């Protein structure tokens, strides 16, 4: 059931009596372009995750990323926001840094994308909200995905299949 409706600026009552906020659909490129400008001013910008490429760490329409312009050298394991040559905006993790550019992958992926130029990368993710809990660098899950999960890209399918089997 699609609960999206025209934004009236006030919550609406659903049939179940639960108050819901109206959702406005906007063009993704336009929306992210505005957020990018804010991040490039040095502000931290929150954004709801859309898509499943960063699963199992981040889940579609549940978790949030918080990003800002990078103030340091980018390195393997960093989550970054970038714009592909096609104009599509993507948030993935740096798999490898080489002289010719940056190589990226999502946490749910085994394919490596790249090389990307440094100027395509406009933001560094500095914290996330996962299942309602804020996770920052230094926290267990942040460090696990940044340092361990990024190193097992070829084995990810087997690891996630085993996890699903054991659940």
Model-based region annotation:
Residues 2-4, 9-167:
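Extended hydrophobic leader/signal-anchor segments used for secretion and membrane insertion
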């Amino acid at each position: 059931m699609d609960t999206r409706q025209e934004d009236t600026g006030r919550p609406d009552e659903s049939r179940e009596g639960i108050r819901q906020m109206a959702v406005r659909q906007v063009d993704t490129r336009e929306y992210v372009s505005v957020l990018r400008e804010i991040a490039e001013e040095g502000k931290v910008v929150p954004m709801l995750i859309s898509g499943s490429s960063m699963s199992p760490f981040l889940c579609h329409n549940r978790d949030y990323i918080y990003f800002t312009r990078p103030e340091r050298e980018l390195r393997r394991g960093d989550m970054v926001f970038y714009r592909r040559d096609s104009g599509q905006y993507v948030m993935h993790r740096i798999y490898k840094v080489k002289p010719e550019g940056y190589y990226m992958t999502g946490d749910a992926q085994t394919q490596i994308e790249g090389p990307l130029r440094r100027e395509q990368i406009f933001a560094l993710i500095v914290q996330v909200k996962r299942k309602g809990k804020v996770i920052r660098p230094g926290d267990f899950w942040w460090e696990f995905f940044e340092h361990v999960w990024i190193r097992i890209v070829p084995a990810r399918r087997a690891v996630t299949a085993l996890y699903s089997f054991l659940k």
